[in-house]
Amino acid sequence: MLESINFTGSFMTAQLRYDLHCHSTVSDGTLTPTAVVERAASRGVDVLALTDHDEIAGLAEARVAAARSGIEFVDGTELSVSWRDITLHIVGLGIDSESPALVAGMRAIRSGRLGRARLMGESLARAGIHGAFEGAARFAANEQLLSRTHFARFLVEGGHVRDVREVFKRYLTPGKPGYVEHVWAALADAYGCWSALRFHRRPGP
């Protein structure tokens, strides 16, 4: 998400380029936190937020890289929660990454991911695709955060589908062979960690 804002005044006109929603290899991105910052700098970004899924482990590295690149950095994350049988992804910006409530809340959210990933591997094996769990794990730099995106990359690499979009359509959405329903922390239960966030909300898949 790369956006720009134009500022105009009596004596000046300026454009601020910002990206406030990006992921690194700490969750399901393909670039390290440092590489994310370097990519943003090469594209003229002035303000950058790293918002990995349910993780803040990449913030310190990204913050150092941003200072080196002259980019204003915003600590962020993207929390996964359940509300009325719907999964929501809450993007928090300007967070307190040392907040005990936030750290504990994200740890609880992450705790079910590995079990879900194993069930996804078993489900895909029953559909004739073997070694999916181990294959997906090769794409995950953070073993605590194995996601559907990592399974998608494995399936594309193995030639089972043409691209990630087709993976989700054929295997990783409700009713498909590799989909495993997961209930995240309830929206109400996640409230305790929100004191560390200034957030906006968007629906998630």
Language-model features: locations:
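Divalent metal-binding pocket/active-site signature
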Residues: 29-30, 114-115, 122, 127-205
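Alpha-helical scaffold segments that flank or form the walls of functional sites
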Residues: 36-47, 100-101, 109-125
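Short, flexible active-site loop motifs that bind/organize anionic cofactors or intermediates
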Residues: 26, 107, 141
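Active-site gating loops and adjacent loop-to-helix segments of metal-dependent hydrolytic enzymes
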Residues: 82-114, 152-173
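Noncatalytic linker/hinge segments flanking ATPase motor cores
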Residues: 55-66, 91-93, 113-123, 130-138
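A short alpha-helix capping/helix-coil boundary motif
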Residues: 14-18, 39-43, 98-101, 130-131, ...
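An N-terminally biased module of ancient metal coordination in phosphate/nucleic-acid-related enzymes
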Residues: 2-86, 172-173, 177, 181-201
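Generic hydrophobic/packing signal
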Residues: 77, 94-96, 128
